[in-house]
Amino acid sequence: MIKVLIADDQELIRQSLSIVLNTKEGIEVTDTVANGQEVIASVRKNRPDVILMDIRMPKMDGVQCTKIIKDNYSEIKIIILTTFDDDEYVYNALKWGASGYLLKGVSMDGLTNAIRTVYSGQAMINPDIATKVVRLFSQMAKADYVVDVDQKRTENLTKTEWKIINEVGRGSSN
């Protein structure tokens, strides 16, 4: 059984999703909440497998909440389910660990499939969003985008390993 938490500031959305998803085989909605702070409290109590998270919510938005959840509960999968496809929202949600980004126009079958897909360890991104992601990735690659490295996790790498990492980062292959 896939345990799902629904986070959206609109009660009608929460209730509708809960009613429909609870009819789907293998899916159980464990809680519905209206903001990011309630997400964190619910995660502590219910430990969902997947969170359906809106972007714009009061008290704490979905992007900030995604970062906090992934920092503390890395095994939980998060699907952003929103009407907003702004580049900044998409980039930051994926940067902080969202496994999916869907627009609210998705069908219920599409949403159910997305839940099962991210639960299995894969990603699910709306086709329009995927186009944005590819464009953003291309822009970053052209700009020699720099990634911060956690020194503690890399202190034992050899010079050869660093050289390989550098080449991969530049897009080289064997």
Where are these regions (language model features)?
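Active-site residues of response regulator receiver
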Residues: 8, 54, 82
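Short hydrophobic/Thr-rich beta-strand motif most characteristic of the beta2 strand and flanking loop
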Residues: 26-34, 42
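Acidic catalytic/metal-coordinating carboxylates
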Residues: 35-38, 61-64
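Active-site beta3 strand of CheY-like receiver
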Residues: 46-52
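Active-site T/S-Asp motif of two-component receiver
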Residues: 53-54, 65
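Receiver (REC) domain active-site loop signature in two-component systems and cognate sites
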Residues: 57
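Short, flexible helix-to-coil linker/hinge segments that flank and couple to helix-turn-helix
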Residues: 89-94, 105-155, 163
